[in-house]
């Protein structure tokens, strides 16, 4: 289920706390919430889904009216360095570089496709804010909080602020 507050949506009146609990119920890390799990399992980067909902014909909106500022959680380019040509099903699960490569490839590929298609659809009306990290950080690594805080403080927001000023102030 994609939660949104679009008029007449079945989720229009859902409470924010319920949406937050459901959308953060990442399998393995957190329990399901009212039979829902983290939407990142289906749409790691929900940009494309948000565009599709925004151009719903019942809303009478045009794609030209959409401005999308997409916030990432930071990325670390981590490719599979091994030769995978002889891998079987087990190798895609148990290999350690990266951990669980089939999941890593699936989630990262899903996010990249969403970003590529979103940019293709919206062109300059799409901006992705997603700082590059110099190391891989697992979702539950509390020891990385200081590093992430420092990364956020040092991140150059000039281009993003310029995009916001250019795109939002013209609407």
Model-predicted segments: where are they?
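Conserved catalytic cores and adjacent C-terminal regulatory segments
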Residues: 1-171
């Amino acid at each position: 289920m994609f939660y949104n507050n679009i008029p007449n949506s079945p989720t229009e009146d859902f409470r924010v706390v319920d949406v937050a609990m459901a959308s953060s119920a990442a399998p393995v890390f957190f329990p399901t919430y009212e039979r829902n799990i983290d939407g990142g399992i289906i749409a790691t980067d929900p940009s494309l889904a948000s565009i599709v909902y925004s151009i719903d014909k019942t809303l009478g909106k045009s794609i030209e009216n959409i401005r999308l500022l997409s916030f990432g959680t930071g990325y670390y380019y981590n490719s599979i360095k091994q030769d995978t040509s002889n891998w079987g099903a087990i190798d895609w699960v148990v290999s350690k570089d990266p951990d669980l490569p089939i999941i890593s490839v699936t989630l990262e590929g899903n996010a990249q496709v969403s970003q590529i298609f979103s940019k293709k659809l919206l062109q300059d009306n799409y901006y992705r804010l997603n700082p590059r990290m110099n190391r891989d950080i697992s979702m539950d690594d509390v020891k990385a909080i200081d590093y992430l805080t420092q990364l956020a403080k040092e991140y150059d927001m000039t281009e993003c602020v310029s995009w916001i000023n250019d795109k939002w102030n013209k609407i």
